[in-house]
From Swiss-Prot:
Family of this protein: Belongs to the serine/threonine dehydratase family. DsdA subfamily.
Enzyme Commission code: 4.3.1.18
Keywords, in A-Z order: Lyase, Pyridoxal phosphate
Transmembrane feature ranges: none
GO terms of molecular function: D-serine ammonia-lyase activity; hydro-lyase activity; pyridoxal phosphate binding
Cofactors required: pyridoxal 5'-phosphate
Protein name per the record: Probable D-serine dehydratase
HAMAP family for the chain: D_Ser_dehydrat
Species, as recorded: Photobacterium profundum (strain SS9)
Modified residues (N6-(pyridoxal phosphate)lysine): K118
InterPro entries per UniProt: D_Ser_am_lyase (IPR011780), Ser/Thr_Dehydratase (IPR050147), Ser/Thr_deHydtase_PyrdxlP-BS (IPR000634), TrpB-like_PALP (IPR001926), TrpB-like_PALP_sf (IPR036052)
A Pfam family assignment: PALP
Amino acid sequence: MSTLNIQQLVTEFPLVEKLIALDDVSWFNPNITTLAEGLPYVGLDKTDIKDASDRLKRFAPYLAKAFPETAKTNGIIESDVVAIPAMKTVLEQQYHIAIQGTLLLKKDSHLPISGSIKARGGIYEVLTHAEKLAIQAGLLSESDDYSKLFTDEFRAFFKQFSIAVGSTGNLGMSIGIMSAKIGFSVSVHMSADARQWKKDKLRSHGVIVVEYKEDYGVAVAQGRKEAEKDPTCFFIDDENSPTLFLGYSVAGERLKSQFEAMNILVDELHPLFVYLPCGVGGGPGGVAFGLKMAFGDNVHCIFAEPTHSPCMLLGIHTGLHDEISVQDIGIDNITAADGLAVGRGSGFVGRAMERLLDGFYTISDERMYHHLGEMSKYEDIQLEPSALAGMLGPVVVSDNEEYLQRIQMDEQKLKNATHLVWATGGGMVPSEEMASYLAKSGI
């Protein structure tokens, strides 16, 4: 984009100037529609989510065997929902604002196998590919007990095939660990932001890690290019994969069941606000789609991005989607929130979900670190910086009278509201790495 175009962009979209200045900004989507109006643009529906859910159930006996940590949930990879009342009080005091309703945390940070939200989509896409190959080869049918995949015979079969992915860290972890376990040869192309411990962990599982000095976009492009040379290699495309998206979407019906068990009501008088950290957009986009299918217009999904990597906000706000990157407007895409260090958002997710997302906001690294320290001190929950992007959400929403009026959110509804912060990673961070995070928090 030329300088002239940037000037035109700023004239047309004044918010872009604040993004360029790296200010904390929020934008509530004036183009949001009902689920009924917005759903056709997604190109997927509840039958697709059911298909994904059924596939994960078929694989549950295999997962329970292959990963003993999932045995207690019978091979279903799911995370807890916990109340964080002390954190709510801290936020209210810190930002001098009353947050009505209940504040909860979704602990995808502590999902088994890879310790992040990416355990949903990444593992699902690997399993989908494995199932397809095994069925095509006549080795598996959908009525089989899938625990038979945990044998040397199947590992030898899958060894003929390879998988590649580009990642800032967590997606690579989930795809690398899952692929290696099932038997695939797997290479993970990792951007400059990727943490050393994540690379070390992958290598300990026999994964080939290819390192880049450039950002996420370059790692993905190179991974794609390498895969194209090998007909037996399957490239998992974080930017454009409906399969990954569906893996994440199953979270909606799962959360609905958890809420029912916890006697948490979600309806027109009891709204649900969900705050999702956003990198390229596949994880939060898929989860938001699943939430919309589970709770309809009574759930309000808000994406949180680092001030240095506001790719999805930039793409949806301007309508340019993946035709613009944060680098085009002079933003460096360098952030401590390594899982969110993405300069160009997914065009697939942006176009699919732009009518179903209530809003976006940006948050500085300093705030993420500060909230990381507070979560550890007051709730004894340890998270990585990316996972704290959502923590500012209840403050941003509570402080925006115009948005609350537009969605007809009166005092009573707000008192009945549930605020859910989606913690995306941190459960597998080594203790010395966590100590350095806590030291930076200033708490």
